[in-house]
């Protein structure tokens, strides 16, 4: 079990890194969008490639961050019911949900989306828009994002089993790390006192 917990920590580290990188992608999307709008209204120039790169980046933010959201224990769930159970009861509910809902859905989407990506790659599929981009990178984001979600679900499963065996702390507790803004607010508050 210790080897599995070590694997779980590795998966968590990868997912955390991807989640942190996605923050920068949001900034890039905003800059591209603003730049496109400024160019369109000031020099009357616009390209479909700018619009498409925005939705490529949006997909690159949204799909991998499903795993990050699972790591942070922020996914929508049946908290109304599970909050009435002890930590062990919640762990059993999470194990059931991972095994019978999350994993089958994620594996199904991964399996069904892979041939779509392969077809786009092999045919060098291009966007229908004039000046558009190649499509296969966008198609790759779907199986890639769901692969990350499957890996994170496996990590969450391992942590729940480890918790039930008394080998790790309760993984259902939400991370309570402060954001940079919250840390700055605390520093300012301490200086004012």
Task: Tell me what each language-model feature is.
Residues 1-193:
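Alpha-helical transmembrane segments and membrane-interface helix-loop junctions
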């Amino acid at each position: 079990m210790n080897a599995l917990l070590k694997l779980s920590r590795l998966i968590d580290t990868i997912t955390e890194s991807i989640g942190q990188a996605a923050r920068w992608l949001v900034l890039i999307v905003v800059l591209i969008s603003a730049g496109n709008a400024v160019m369109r209204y000031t020099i009357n120039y616009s390209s479909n490639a700018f619009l498409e790169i925005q939705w490529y980046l949006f997909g690159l933010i949204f799909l991998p961050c499903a795993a990050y959201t699972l790591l942070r224990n922020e996914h929508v769930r049946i908290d109304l019911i599970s909050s009435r159970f002890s930590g062990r009861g919640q762990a059993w509910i999470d194990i059931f949900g991972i095994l019978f809902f999350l994993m089958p859905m994620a594996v199904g989407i991964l399996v069904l989306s892979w041939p779509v990506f392969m077809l786009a790659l092999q045919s060098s599929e291009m966007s229908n828009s004039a000046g558009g981009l190649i499509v296969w990178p966008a198609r790759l984001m779907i199986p890639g994002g769901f692969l990350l979600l499957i890996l994170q679900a496996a990590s969450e499963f391992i942590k729940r089993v480890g918790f039930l065996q008394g080998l790790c702390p309760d993984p259902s507790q939400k991370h309570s790390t402060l954001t940079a803004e919250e840390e700055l607010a605390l520093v300012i508050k301490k200086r004012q006192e």
